[in-house]
A protein has these predicted regions:
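Surface-exposed helix-capping loop/turn segments at secondary-structure junctions
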Residues: 91-95, 131-139, 159-165, 194-199
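Well-ordered alpha-helical scaffold segments within catalytic/enzyme domains
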Residues: 1-6, 57-71, 120-140, 183-197
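Active-site lining segments of carbohydrate-active enzymes
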Residues: 45-46, 60-72, 79-80, 84-87, ...
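C-terminal transactivation domains of fungal Zn(2)-Cys(6)
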Residues: 101, 129, 133-145, 149-153, ...
Length: 246
């Protein structure tokens, strides 16, 4: 965490807001609060909705703050959120994650396996576990790692011929997407480095790296990156997201 009094105060305020004020779903899940459609200054609460985005954007932060400031209640809340997001977003049939879950609809919206959303778990969950420095309950850690390994097995089977993954992972007619592919690759490489995955995953990672490098322009612009992606009710929503090089 950046050691600047101003930013430290902001981070503490945000952590307290997450614990005390963030809108919650049934069972206490964090709602994924976003900017309003067409209004970056507005707020959309996404009532009773859980998104995979939240794990990477919010839960990692809460755990890191809890670890830094010795706030066990913040750490415990982060564990609850990880387990709850796995409970409602992980698909045991495929090993992949749905983008979201609605307690109002009692379904996973369009039931779509979005590449970038899955990549946030692949990479983010190892960063999350790293923060515990071996202190996480072994049963919880094993459950999370088993989920990670099952997801990576599924992702390896879905890698495109050129090395990238499609924005709808199990739909080869959807475009290949670089940002999600990069995070998946980083998550696989970190898994190998940590000894969680064996070296049989190296060819998959190396193939992806070659494809990713081909999609970085000479000025550093990353090509084939899908723009901001809200919740979709069908595959076409994701397939029609504009490509916005970064």
């Amino acid at each position: 965490i950046y050691h600047d009094p101003e930013f430290e105060a902001l981070c503490l305020d945000w952590a307290k807001w997450l614990m005390e004020c963030i809108p919650r779903t049934r069972e206490g899940g964090f709602q994924h609060v976003t900017s309003a459609n067409g209004d970056r200054q507005g707020v959309r609460l996404n009532e009773s909705e859980m998104w995979i985005d939240t794990l990477f954007m919010t839960v990692l932060f809460l755990n890191r703050m809890g670890q830094k400031y010795g706030k066990q209640e913040w750490i415990d809340e982060s564990i609850k959120q990880v387990l709850m997001h796995i409970k409602y977003l992980y698909d045991t049939h495929t090993g992949l994650f749905f983008h979201g879950w609605s307690f109002n609809r009692m379904d996973n919206f369009g039931g779509v396996f979005w590449c970038r959303g899955n990549s946030w778990f692949t990479l983010g969950i190892l960063d999350y576990l790293d923060m515990f420095k071996g202190t996480l309950n072994q049963g919880v850690k094993t459950f999370i790692l088993d989920t990670y390994k099952a997801q990576v097995r599924a992702l390896r089977d879905l890698q495109g011929e050129d090395g990238l993954w499609h924005t709808v992972l199990d739909d080869s007619t959807s475009y290949e997407e670089t940002s999600g592919s990069a995070a998946i690759t980083a998550g696989i490489l970190k898994g190998i480095r940590m000894g969680i995955l064996d070296d049989s995953y190296l060819p998959c990672a190396k193939k992806a790296i070659r494809a990713i490098l081909k999609n970085i322009d000479t000025d550093g612009t990353v090509l084939k990156v899908s723009g901001g992606t809200g919740m979709g009710y069908d595959r076409d929503h994701y397939k029609n997201i504009l490509i916005a090089p970064m």
